[in-house]
Amino acid sequence: MAKLAGQLVEALDGLLGVPVPLRVQAWDGSVAGPPGAPTVVLRNRRALRRLVWQPNELGLARAYVAGDLELAPGTDLYETLSAVARFAERPEIRTMALGPRDVIGPRGRKALGAVLRAGALGPEPTPPPEEVRRAQGRLHSRSRDRAAISHHYDVGNEFYGLVLGSSMVYSCAYWTPEAKSLEAAQEAKLDLICRKLGLRPGMRLLDVGCGWGSLLLHAAKHYGVTAVGVSISKEQVALARARVEEAGLADRVEVRLQDYREIADGPFDAISSVGMAEHVGSEQYRVYAEGLYRLLVPGGRLLNHQIARRPDIPGEPHRTSSFIDRYVFPDGELSPVGSTVARLEEAGFEVRDVESLREHYGLTLREWVANLEAHWTEAVRLVGRGRARVWRLYMAASALAFEQNRIGVNQVLAVRSTEEGSAGLPPTREEWLVRPAAGVPAATPVVTAAETDLGDSRSVR
C-alpha cells in the first residue's frame, strides 16, 4: 500500500496515453505525480470507485461534491482547474470518450490491476444528493423548465445574498475604471443596459427573467419607467416583490411568477433579457425571439445579454458539460453568438450592436467565489456542504472558462424597426449610449392573450 499513489498515477497515465498534470495523494498517505503540480487527495476507496465507473468530468465532480476527493492544503483551486482544463483541451484527450469498459478492458489492464490492489473494485457509488437524476417531461416544456429553474434558483435567497452581495445581480458586472467594488460594477452594468435601451420617464419596460428585481428597481428609480418583471423562480419573485415594496415603487413596478411564453399584455417600449436566454434552449429559441418581437412596439429596443459558447470544432461532435447539466443548470444550452444574432434577425429584429463582456464575467465570478469562501461556514449551514462545493467548483471553473476564451458573454442590442424602417436610434453609438433617442414611439394596441400565448409547441429550426 505504500506505493499506492504511484501505481494509480502510472495506471492512469497508461490509460490516457499521456501524463496527467496532477499529483495524487492516496488515502494511505503516499504521493506521486509531477513535482510542483497541483495535488489532489483521494480520501478513500470510494473516490477511486467513482472514477472507475465515470472516468471523466462527471466522476471527478461527484467525488469532489461528495467529499471523497479534496485539494491538498496549499493547493490553489484555480491552478488545479486550469491545469485540468488545458489537459482536457489536448486533441488526444478532447476526442476521447472513456467509460468503465475502458478501465476493465485490455486498454485499462494496468488501471484495473491498480484498482484491484487498492481494494476499490465494487458497485457504482450512489451520486451525491445534489445531482439531478432524470428530468421529467419534454425538454423545455413549461413544467420541466420550472423544475430546472427551481433546482438552481430556489436554493435560498439568503445563500444568494452571501454570494452575490448587496446588489443581488446574478450576471456579469461592468468593470469601468470608476467601479472599485462588485456593487459599483453591478450598478454600472444596470445603467449600461438602461442607456442602451434608451429608457426615459413614461416608458414601459419588460424584464424577462428578472431575478431579484435589481434591474427593475434601477430603471424605475433612475429612469422613471414603469416596469414588469417575470420569473419562474418562486423565491426570486418573493424577494423581488419585497424589495419593490421596500423601495416604495409598487405603483410602477410589478413582479410576476410567470413563464415568458405566457406574457399577454404587451406592448412594451423596451425589453431586457439578462442571463435568461441560456435557459430557453435551441428548439424554443425561435418561440422566444418571435414572442419578444411581438411584445415590443415598433421602434422599441431589445437588450439580450447572453452567455455564448465557441462554435463546434469541424469534424468533432458537440460537447456539453455533464457536471453543469447534472449539478448546476439542468437543460441549460449555450449557442455561439452568431447563432443568437441570426435567430433574432429571423424573428424580425434588426441587430444594431453586439458588445462582448467576456473579461468582465471572469472578474465577476472571482468576486463571487471570494464571497462564498469568505462566508463558507454560513453557506454550508444554509445549503449544505455538497451544494456549497458545487457552487465553488462551478463558479471557479466558469471564471477560468471566460478568462481563457472557452465561453463568452455578449450584450446584443436589437430593434423592432417601424414600418418606414426607422430604428429610432441616434446616428452614432456614442450618442445612443449617453442619451435616449428623440421622440416617443407610437403606442400599439394591446395584444390579446390568444395572440401572444406561445404554448409548448416545438419550433422549426
What are these regions (language model features)?
Residues 240-241:
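Conserved SAM-binding loop
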Residues 261-271:
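A short acidic, Gly/Pro-enriched loop at the edge of an enzyme's catalytic core
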